[in-house]
């Protein structure tokens, strides 16, 4: 439910004092009434390095503030679910979501609109990985042997770290994950944690975003000889930037189109690096209909 913003008595009293002095400060419009501060608040799912979210995504906020000539504030989220809850409560009006959390946001807020995705998000993949000690190697065939291993997902709300891997387990084995695995799977909470925990042997196998795995290998944080990619899924749509309909009330009719175009036009290296994307492209809610259908079959919460 969208929460209304109510001025406090203290704020009204202060506004009255300022009017008496003939000022127009603190958001007054000259009529003696305090005006609401116009801010676009933006958040993102904590898919990796959850302690450095603000530092990571501030360049996106800076780019949008400059491109749209408005104030933009990044608001960290402690979990996937928290990012959707903030959006539902209108505490944020723009979210960098995964496919699952994006669908959740669109479902819970009538009029919410998916604006953009990275080019690679239209053909995203998950990697199944295993500790080298298991003896499993890369194959085009689904790794059915992981049924006997200690396995971890990322977050239970992660598209590439849980929902789609579970979908492909079901598609290839005819069994739900709880039936397929001999031991109940774990949840690391984030893609990078999945890779690290498989590499150090905390878990024997896991599933994560292909992009995170490749980035960790390129940075030397993961040794592909120790955390071995054993299978990659078929492609699916994933990450997206979804906007709250109230932005049109705050910034005027047509603002969502302007926001979408600003994101598509983005060539700011720091902003694109924050999103781990080279280019953003237009999408709409229908782009994620396939994810919505999978979510009806695969449920963990």
Model-inferred region functions:
Residues 17-20:
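C-terminal motif of bacterial Sec signal peptides marking the signal peptidase cleavage site
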Residues 22-25:
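Bacterial signal peptide processing site
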Residues 32-57, 280:
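Extracytoplasmic "Venus flytrap"
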Residues 41-46, 119-127, 221-260, 273-290:
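Periplasmic-binding protein-like
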Residues 58-69, 145, 160-187, 215-222, ...:
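Ligand-binding cleft/hinge of the Venus flytrap
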Residues 74-85, 98-100, 177-196, 237:
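Short helix-initiation/N-cap motifs at beta->coil->alpha
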Residues 96-109, 170-171, 197-200, 204-224:
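A ligand-binding cleft/hinge motif common to bilobed small-molecule-binding domains
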Residues 118-173:
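A conserved helix-loop-strand patch within extracytoplasmic ligand-binding domains
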